[in-house]
Design a protein with these regions (language model features):
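Charged, gly/pro-rich active-site loop segments
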Residues: 1-13, 85-153
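Short beta-strand segments
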Residues: 25-59, 67, 73-77, 86-88
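Short, conserved active-site entrance elements at the starts or edges of catalytic domains
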Residues: 4-32
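Short, surface-exposed beta-strand-loop junctions and turns on beta-sheet-rich folds
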Residues: 61-63, 82, 148-149
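Short secondary-structure boundary/capping segments
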Residues: 19-20, 45, 65, 122-124
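Short, solvent-exposed cationic patches
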Residues: 4-10, 60-78, 114-118
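Generic structural signal for secondary-structure transition and capping sites
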Residues: 26-27, 72, 116, 139
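Amphipathic alpha-helical interface surfaces
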Residues: 18, 60-63, 103-107
């Protein structure tokens, strides 16, 4: 992975701040490439583990079809409240179906607590689960809580 980059107009995260930020159960936005060249962007739950983003979905989804054709993806995770902070990850996605139903339990529990396992089982009973593992090639961060040209709200 390249060194973390920052936008020129605003401070970014340190490595420690990045890990702390990504430990929060924020909503990620995954962008993949459609066959016509347009971008397909969807909200998705994630977990940051061992320097990679793990995203949970089903094999029948458009995002999975897109990744099968072109594994280059972008993921945006931000605070969604002022003063804003966030991370944009550009990387390569790998689809992992090995024990995906179990792996997604920890992701679901980050967002819905003790019911995560039940929800994961219900989805797996209907559709084959898959973990999208994103290996970052470039990370850009922004942290307006450190000051910027944007006034605090």
């Amino acid at each position: 992975m390249e060194e973390m980059k920052r936008y020129p107009q605003v401070p970014g995260f340190s490595e420690v701040e990045l890990a702390a930020f990504l430990a929060q159960p924020l909503l990620a936005r995954l962008s993949t490439h459609n066959t016509d060249g347009s971008i397909h962007t969807i909200p998705i739950w994630y977990e940051y583990r061992d320097g990679k983003l793990l995203l949970s979905t089903q094999t029948i989804t458009q995002k999975v079809k897109n990744i099968q054709r072109n594994p280059q993806v972008t993921v945006l995770i931000d605070s969604n409240t002022m003063p804003y902070a966030g991370v944009m990850v550009v990387g390569t996605a790998v689809l992992d179906t090995q024990n995906a139903a179990q792996k997604r339990v920890t992701i679901f529990e980050r967002y819905i607590g003790q019911h995560g396992g039940t929800y994961a089982q219900q989805l797996a009973a209907k559709w084959e689960p898959v973990i999208i593992e994103v290996t970052p090639e470039r990370i850009l961060s922004f942290d307006y809580t450190k000051g910027s040209l944007v006034p605090n709200a």
